[in-house]
Curated annotation (Swiss-Prot):
Keyword Coiled coil applies: yes
Cross-referenced SUPFAM superfamilies: C2 domain (Calcium/lipid-binding domain, CaLB)
Region feature (Disordered): 352-408, 912-937
Keyword check for DNA repair: no
Species whose genome carries this gene: Bos taurus (Bovine)
Protein name from the UniProt record: Centrosomal protein of 120 kDa
Skewed-composition ranges (Basic and acidic residues): 912-926
Chain ranges of the C2 domain: 1-112, 438-567
Primary localisation category: cytoplasm
Family in the record: Belongs to the CEP120 family.
Name of the coding gene: CEP120
Subunit annotation: Interacts with TACC2 and TACC3. Interacts with CCDC52.
Modified sites of kind Phosphoserine: S936
Length: 987
C-alpha cells in the first residue's frame, strides 16, 4: 500500500481564454489526457473571452510521478467547438503541458497559445496553471462501487436531529457486527448476504484487441460489502465458467428504519469481473428493494433481490460501443438477501450452470469480524521430483489439433519418463496354476524371462540448423517408438523459431527409455524399424502444419564402439554412443531437404534381467508398477531319474504355458486397447463438443464484433465515397479554375505585350513628331526673328517720321487744344467704362451673395430640423449651441459684408475724386453752363445711392437670415436716414 503522504494529485486549473471569435451557436470544451485517462471541462459559451473555471485532477503516487517525469510524459489539452444541435465537434487546437513544471508550491497561472489553431486570424490563448497537491482523502480501491448521490431519506421522528448523511456502518470488532445508526436506538440484529451463483457469456467482455496480463489468466468476481472487499474462487475458463457459488455474509446491528435510510443512501452494489487488477466488466445490484417503505416482510421471511444482471465493460460509454444483443450479453447470477438474525435460511437462488444440473453446495463466507481468510483452491498432490533430461508431458494448454492423440493418451495422467516394458518374454519358470492364482491375488502379471537384458536407450535431439525454406518456422519435434514401451508421442516444448543461417538448440529434447528385451530382437528391430522424427510448425492463428520427417537409423549405434562402466549394483555394464546430423525431408511436393537435425543416441546394457513379475494395471495410462519377486527355481532333475514323456517335461509345459500366456495376453491387450479406444473416443467426443461450444460462442462473439465493425466500415465507406465525390468535384473545380487562371494569365500577358508594343510604337511616333515640331519651330523662329528685325527697323523709321511730324504740328495752338480735348474724352470714356464694369460686378456680387445666403439659410434650416429631430432630449443645450454658432457666423458675415461695403465705398470715393479731378477744366471752359447741371447731378447721385441702400437692405431682409435688430440692417437704415436728411437739406 502507498502511504497517504506519497499519494498526490496532479491538478490542472483551466481558468479562462482570450482572443477567441464569437460563435453564439457553439460551445467550447477543453479535454485533458494524461496516462491514458481523459478528463473534460463543462461546455461554456463560445465568446471572445470564455470562462472555464475548472480544475482537472489525476491521482498518482510519487514513484509513478518520478517515472512519468523521467519519461517526459506530457499532459495534452485539446480544445473543441461543440454544436449542441448536432453534437458535432470541431478541433480548435491543442496545448501540451510539461509534467516537470508541476510543483507542490502554488504557482501563478500562465497564458498558453493554442497550437494548430483553426482560427488563423486569432491568436487564441488559455490561462492554465498546473500544480501538485497532497491527496488527503482516504484511499479507495479502484474497483469499489462509488457512492450514489445522496437521496432524501426520512429519519424516524425520535431521531429527527440525525442527518441521513451521517449514517455509516461502523465495525464493532468485539461484538462481531457492523453498527448502523445510534447504538442506543438501533439494537436489532440482521444478516446481509450476497451470493454469486453463475455467469454466462463472459467472453463477450474481452475484445479481440485486448491483451490479458498472464498467459493463463485467472478471473474472479469482486465487490465491496460494507467496506469489506470480497472475491470469489478464481476460475480460468471464460467460455464455460465453472466455480462454486459462494455466499458472503455480514452481521448488522441496526433498526429497520435506519437500515432503510442507509440502503436508500447506498442504493447500489457494484460487482466487477476482474483479471488481476483489471476490471473487465461490472454491474449494479439495486438494494432499495430489500426494505420497501411500509413493508413488514422482513419480520416473517428473508427479503431478497436476485436475478441475472448484465455485465457492462468499463469503457463502453467512452468508446461509444454498439450494444450487444440480448442473447449474447454477459450476465452474472446474483442474490442479495437480508433477514433478521436467527431466521432459517433457505436457498435463495437456483444455481444454474451449463455443464451440470445437480445442486451445488455453496461456500459460506462470514466477513465479520474481519479476519484474513484467504480462499484458495485445492492443492494439487505433490509430485515426485522429475529427473534431469525429463521429457515433460504435453499439457492441455499447449495442445492443438495436431496433439489430440497425445492429449487423449496422457489425459489426467503423468508420463513416466522411463517407461518399462517387456517386449519379448522368455520361458516361464512357474506353472500355469501359480500364474493364475497370482493373477487372482494381485492382478495381471508378466513374467520376464531371465535371458532378457535390461537396456536403457536415450535420445537427445540437440539442434536444428541450415534452414532451406524462405520463411522462419516456429517448430517442435515429435516422435514415438512403441518398441521402447510407450506409444505416447514425445515432443519438444516450447516451440522455437528457426531462421536461415542460424542454429537453434531444442529445449526439453532429452528422453530415456528403460526396457527389457533380447539382444537379437533389439538388433533386429533397430535394423527393420527406423525412428521417424516429425517437424511441426505451430501457429496460434491456424492449425499446426507438418513440414517434414527425419529418418534416424537406430542400427548405427550397434556398430559404434562399446565402453565399459559400473552400474549402481557394482555390475559391469556396456555403453554405446552415436551422434550425427540427418536431413528433415518435406512431406509434400518434391522431397527436398528443409533443415538438418543433429542428435545423439546412447544405448546402455545393464546385463541379464533376473526373474521378475510385472503387474499390469487396467488404468488408461498403460504403465505398471514393477514388483520384483525372487522366484525359487526348481532344482534340475538328476540324470539318474527315469526319462519322462516329452509332453510331461518341464520344457514342454513351460512352452505350453508360454503359448497360453501369449494368447491370454493378446486377449487382455485387445480388451485394454478397446477400452482405451472407447475411453479415448469418449474423451475426444467430449473435448470436441466442448471445443465446438467454445468455437460457437467465439464465432458468435466474432460475428457480433464483425457486424459492429461492418456497420462502422459501411459508414466509413459511405463517408469516404462522399469525401471522394467532394474531392472529385473540388478537383474538377480546381482544374477548371486553374485552366481559367492559365487562360486569363495568357490573355493578360498577351494584352500586356500588345500594350507594351503599342506604347513603344507611340513613343517612337511621338519622338518623330517632336523632332519634326522642333525643326518647324526652329524654322519659325528664324522667320519670326527676321520679321522682328524688319519691324524694328520699320518702327524706328516711323518713329523718326512721327517725331518730325509732331514737331511740326506742335507749333499750332488749335492742334494742341484739340489734342487735349481728345485726351480728356478718352479718359472720360475709360472712366465710364470702369464705372459700368464696377456697377455690373457689384450687381453680380449681390446676386451671388443673395444666392449664397439663401443656400446657407436652407442648409441651416435643414441642419436645425435634423438636429431637433435627433436630439430632442438635449434641445436647450443644442439651441444655445445653434445660437452661438449663428451669432459667430453672423458676426463673420457682417464683418465680411462690412469690409465689402467699405471697399465699395472707397472705390466710389476714389471714382468721385477722379471725376472731380477730370472735370475742373471743363467747368472753367463752360462755367456758365455748369452751374445748373451740377446741382441736378448731385441730386441724382443721392437718389441713386439711396435707391441702392434700400435695395441692399431689402435683399438682406428677403434672405430670412437677418431681421431689423441685426447690426448690418441697423447700419443700412442709418445710412438711408442720413441720405434722406442730406437730400432734404439740399432741397
Amino acid at each position: 500500500m502507498v502511504s497517504k503522504s506519497d499519494q498526490l494529485l496532479i491538478v490542472v486549473s483551466i481558468l479562462e481564454g482570450r482572443h477567441f471569435p464569437k460563435r453564439p451557436k457553439h460551445m467550447l470544451i477543453v479535454e485533458a489526457k494524461f496516462d491514458g485517462e481523459q478528463l473534460a471541462t463543462d461546455p461554456v459559451d463560445h465568446t471572445d473571452q470564455p470562462e472555464f473555471a475548472t480544475e482537472l485532477a489525476w491521482e498518482i503516487d510519487r514513484k509513478a510521478l518520478h517515472q512519468h517525469r523521467l519519461q517526459r510524459t506530457p499532459i495534452k489539452l485539446q480544445c473543441f467547438a461543440l454544436d449542441p444541435s448536432t453534437s458535432a465537434r470541431e478541433t480548435i487546437g491543442y496545448i501540451v503541458l510539461d509534467l516537470r513544471t508541476a510543483q507542490e508550491t502554488k504557482q501563478a497561472p500562465k497564458w498558453y497559445q493554442l497550437l494548430s489553431n483553426k482560427y488563423t486570424k486569432f491568436k487564441s490563448e488559455i490561462q492554465i496553471s498546473i500544480a501538485l497537491e497532497t491527496d488527503t482523502k482516504a484511499p479507495v480501491d479502484s474497483f469499489k462501487a462509488k457512492g450514489a448521490p445522496p437521496r432524501d431519506g426520512k429519519v424516524p421522528a425520535s431521531l429527527s436531529g440525525l442527518d441521513p448523511k451521517d449514517i455509516v456502518a461502523v465495525l464493532n470488532e468485539e461484538g462481531g457486527y457492523h453498527q448502523i445508526g445510534p447504538a442506543g436506538y438501533c439494537t436489532d440484529f440482521f444478516i446481509m448476504s450476497v451470493t454469486i451463483a453463475f455467469a454466462t457469456q463472459l467472453e463477450q467482455l474481452i475484445p479481440c484487441t485486448m491483451k490479458l496480463p498472464e498467459r493463463q489468466p485467472e478471473f474472479f468476481f469482486y465487490y465491496s460489502l460494507l467496506g469489506n472487499d470480497v472475491t470469489n474462487e478464481p476460475f480460468s475458463d471464460l467460455i464455460n465458467p465453472n466455480f462454486e457459488p459462494e455466499r458472503a455474509s455480514v452481521r448488522i446491528r441496526s433498526s429497520i428504519e435506519i437500515l432503510r435510510v442507509y440502503l436508500t443512501l447506498h442504493s447500489k452494489l457494484q460487482i466487477h469481473l476482474c483479471c488481476g487488477d483489471q476490471s473487465l466488466g461490472s454491474t449494479e445490484i439495486p438494494l432499495t428493494g430489500l426494505l420497501k417503505k411500509g413493508s413488514t416482510e422482513i419480520n416473517h421471511r428473508p427479503v431478497t433481490v436476485e436475478g441475472a444482471f448484465t455485465l457492462d465493460p468499463p469503457n463502453r460509454a467512452k468508446q461509444k460501443l454498439a450494444p450487444i444483443p440480448v442473447e449474447l450479453a454477459p450476465t452474472v447470477g446474483v442474490s442479495v438477501a437480508l433477514q433478521r438474525e436467527g431466521m432459517d435460511v433457505q436457498s435463495l437462488i437456483e444455481l444454474k450452470t451449463q455443464n451440470e444440473h445437480e445442486p451445488h453446495h455453496s461456500k459460506k463466507r462470514v466477513l465479520t469480524p474481519i479476519k484474513e481468510n484467504t480462499h484458495t483452491g485445492p492443492q494439487s498432490p505433490s509430485e515426485s521430483p522429475v529427473p534431469p533430461h525429463n521429457q515433460s508431458p504435453p499439457t492441455k494448454d499447449d495442445a492443438t489439433e495436431s496433439e489430440v492423440e497425445s492429449l487423449l493418451y496422457d489425459k489426467d495422467t503423468k508420463l513416466n519418463p522411463k517407461a518399462i516394458s517387456s517386449s519379448v518374454p522368455a520361458l516361464l519358470a512357474k506353472p500355469v496354476t501359480t500364474s493364475i492364482a497370482s493373477e487372482a491375488a494381485s492382478g495381471q502379471k508378466i513374467a520376464v524371462p531371465a535371458t532378457s537384458h535390461h537396456f536403457c536407450f536415450s535420445i537427445d535431439l540437440r539442434s536444428i540448423h541450415d534452414l532451406e525454406v524462405g520463411f522462419p518456422i516456429n517448430c517442435i519435434l515429435r516422435y514415438s517408438y512403441p518398441f521402447f514401451g510407450s506409444a505416447a508421442p514425445i515432443m519438444t516444448n516450447p516451440p522455437v523459431e528457426v531462421r536461415k543461417n542460424m542454429e537453434v538448440f531444442l529445449p526439453q529434447s532429452y528422453c530415456a527409455f528403460d526396457f527389457a528385451t533380447l539382444p537379437h530382437q533389439l538388433q533386429d528391430t533397430f535394423l527393420r524399424i527406423p525412428l521417424l522424427v516429425e517437424l511441426w510448425h505451430k501457429d496460434k492463428m491456424s492449425k499446426d502444419l507438418l513440414l517434414g520427417i527425419a529418418r534416424i537409423q537406430l542400427s548405427n549405434i550397434l556398430s559404434s564402439e562399446k565402453t565399459r562402466f559400473l552400474g549402481s549394483n557394482g555390475e559391469q555394464c556396456w555403453r554405446q554412443t552415436f551422434s550425427e546430423s540427418v536431413p528433415i525431408v518435406a512431406t509434400q511436393g518434391s522431397n527436398n531437404r528443409i533443415v538438418d537435425l543433429s542428435y545423439t543416441v546412447t544405448l546402455e546394457d545393464y546385463g541379464l534381467v533376473k526373474m521378475r513379475e510385472i503387474f499390469v494395471s487396467d488404468s488408461s495410462q498403460g504403465l505398471s508398477a514393477v514388483q520384483q519377486k525372487p522366484s525359487s527355481v526348481p532344482p534340475a532333475p538328476c540324470p539318474s531319474e527315469i526319462q519322462t514323456e516329452p509332453r510331461e517335461t518341464l520344457e514342454y509345459k513351460a512352452a505350453l504355458e508360454l503359448e497360453m500366456w501369449k494368447e491370454m495376453q493378446e486377449d487382455i491387450f485387445e480388451n485394454q486397447l478397446k477400452q482405451k479406444e472407447l475411453a479415448h473416443m469418449q474423451a475426444l467426443a467430449e473435448e470436441w463438443k466442448k471445443r465446438d461450444r467454445e468455437r460457437e460462442s467465439l464465432v458468435k462473439k466474432k460475428v457480433a464484433e464483425y457486424n459492429i465493425l461492418e456497420g462502422k466500415l459501411q459508414k466509413t465507406l459511405i463517408d469516404l465515397e462522399k469525401r471522394e465525390q467532394q474531392l472529385a468535384i473540388a478537383e474538377s473545380e480546381l482544374q477548371r479554375e486553374r485552366r481559367e487562371l492559365k487562360s486569363e494569365r495568357e490573355r493578360n500577358l498577351q494584352e500586356l505585350q500588345d500594350s507594351i508594343r503599342r506604347a513603344k510604337e507611340d513613343c517612337v511616333h511621338q519622338v518623330e513628331l517632336e523632332r519634326l515640331k522642333m525643326k518647324q519651330l526652329e524654322e519659325d523662329k528664324h522667320r519670326l526673328q527676321q520679321q522682328l528685325n524688319d519691324a524694328e527697323n520699320k518702327y524706328k523709321t516711323l518713329e523718326k517720321e512721327f517725331h518730325q511730324f509732331k514737331d511740326q504740328q506742335s507749333s499750332k495752338p488749335e492742334i494742341r487744344l484739340q489734342s487735349e480735348i481728345n485726351l480728356l474724352t478718352l479718359e472720360k470714356v475709360e472712366l465710364e467704362r470702369k464705372l459700368e464694369s464696377a456697377t455690373k460686378s457689384k450687381l453680380h456680387y449681390k446676386q451671388q451673395w443673395g444666392r449664397a445666403l439663401k443656400e446657407l439659410a436652407r442648409l441651416k434650416q435643414r441642419e436645425q430640423e435634423s438636429q431637433m429631430a435627433r436630439l430632442k432630449k438635449q434641445q436647450e443645450e443644442l439651441e444655445q449651441m445653434r445660437l452661438r454658432y449663428l451669432a459667430a457666423e453672423e458676426k463673420d458675415t457682417v464683418k465680411t459684408e462690412r469690409q465689402e461695403l467699405l471697399d465699395i465705398r472707397n472705390e466710389l470715393n476714389r471714382l468721385r475724386q477722379q471725376e472731380q479731378k477730370q472735370y475742373p477744366d471743363s467747368r472753367e471752359i463752360a462755367s456758365g453752363k455748369m452751374d445748373g447741371p451740377h446741382g441736378s447731378a448731385l441730386e441724382e447721385g443721392l437718389d441713386d445711392y439711396l435707391t441702392r441702400l434700400i435695395e441692399e437692405r431689402d435683399t438682406l431682409m428677403r434672405t430670412g437670415v437677418y431681421n431689423h435688430e441685426d447690426r448690418i440692417i441697423s447700419e443700412l437704415d442709418r445710412q438711408i436716414r442720413e441720405v434722406l436728411a442730406k437730400n432734404n437739406a439740399s432741397n
